[in-house]
Curated annotation (Swiss-Prot):
Keywords attached to this entry: Dioxygenase, Heme, Iron, Metal-binding, Oxidoreductase, Tryptophan catabolism
Lineage, highest ranks first: Bacteria, Bacillati, Actinomycetota, Actinomycetes, Kineosporiales
Binding-site residues, heme: H242
Organism in which the protein naturally occurs: Kineococcus radiotolerans (strain ATCC BAA-149 / DSM 14245 / SRS30216)
Binding locations of substrate: F53, I54, V55, Q56, H57, Y115, R119, T256
Assigned protein family: Belongs to the tryptophan 2,3-dioxygenase family.
Name this polypeptide is given: Tryptophan 2,3-dioxygenase
Database matches in InterPro entries: Trp/Indoleamine_2_3_dOase-like, Trp_2-3-dOase_bac, Trp_2_3_dOase
């Protein structure tokens, strides 16, 4: 028995606003005209799958913008000894990380044959040049002043990275917070050159062991430690999915930005933000 079109149509309620001559619309609030006009495939003739490649990376950049927003808030909160706010920020970052990691499954639908037909139009542009990705790494403590050279052409981007390079990282702020709470944090870490990457410090492992083995007493610190481990693990999962997506798409070709490609990405898996939080696991209960 067939129905009617009216039965399968939702009526617009009387209270729904339809006149936007004097009101701000959804599209205006989000600046959708500019956002949806920002995809400019360069392949000639235009290749169908280049739009996928562009949208994948543009949406990633939007999520990275939000990650930075939340990490900056978390660092300010920790500096003010407001760990509850910081943990809320970090929880949101973790959800964004999972979204970013899952997005690789969309790009993985791009076959090697399809990508090869427009890859040459990328010239030397590469995700390695993502200023926001580098900013996230700096905020988490993986700092390298040489990376600034890549952004010499980008005044505002270079300035933001310089600011993050010279500021304490999320981990630096957390260790300072622990010291203010009376935990035994080595002075060398509290006074270190924050423009350098954090180096594994065995003496700090003992401090974390105290927290982990008396979690009820130090519950807030314990919870924060586990949140940081989640943060790093999610980041490593993103790196791994990136590597495997690149491998299945271009094999072991060199990257468009001049890197060795998969080999270069694989070495990033050895980098760590919070090494003592992993090292302490060997010590607990022993």
């Amino acid at each position: 028995m067939s129905g009617t079109a009216e039965e399968n149509t939702r009526e617009v309620e009387a209270g729904v606003v339809t006149d936007f001559t004097r009101e701000m619309s959804y599209g205006e609030y989000l600046h959708l005209d500019e956002l949806l006009a920002a995809q400019h495939p360069l392949s000639t003739p235009e290749h169908h799958d280049e739009l996928l490649f562009i949208v994948q990376h543009q949406t990633s950049e939007l999520w990275l913008k939000l990650v930075l927003h939340e990490l900056r808030s978390a660092m300010r909160a920790i500096a003010a000894d407001d760990l509850k706010t910081a943990l809320k920020n970090i929880a949101r970052v973790k959800h964004i990380q999972r979204t970013l990691t899952e997005q690789w499954s969309v790009l993985a639908t791009l076959t090697p044959t399809e990508y090869a037909q427009f890859r040459g139009f990328l010239a030397n542009s590469s995700g390695f040049q993502s200023q926001q990705y580098r900013a996230v790494e700096f905020a988490l403590g993986n700092k390298n002043a040489k990376m600034l050279d890549v952004f010499a052409h980008d005044g505002p981007g270079h300035a933001q990275l310089t600011e993050l390079l010279e500021a304490p990282s999320l981990y630096d702020e957390f260790l300072r917070h622990l010291a203010r709470r009376g935990h035994d944090v080595p002075a060398e870490l509290l006074e270190r050159d924050v423009t350098k990457a954090h180096v594994h410090t065995p003496a700090l492992v003992a401090t974390f062991r105290v927290i982990y083995e008396d979690a009820q007493r130090y519950w807030t610190e314990y919870e924060a430690c586990e949140e940081l481990v989640d943060l790093e693990e999610n980041f490593q999962l993103w790196r791994f999915r990136h590597l495997k997506t690149v491998e299945r798409t271009i094999g072991f070709k060199r990257g468009t930005g001049g890197s060795s490609g998969v080999g270069f990405l694989a070495r990033a898996l050895d980098l760590t933000f919070f090494p003592e939080l992993y090292a302490v696991r060997t010590e607990i209960g022993s």
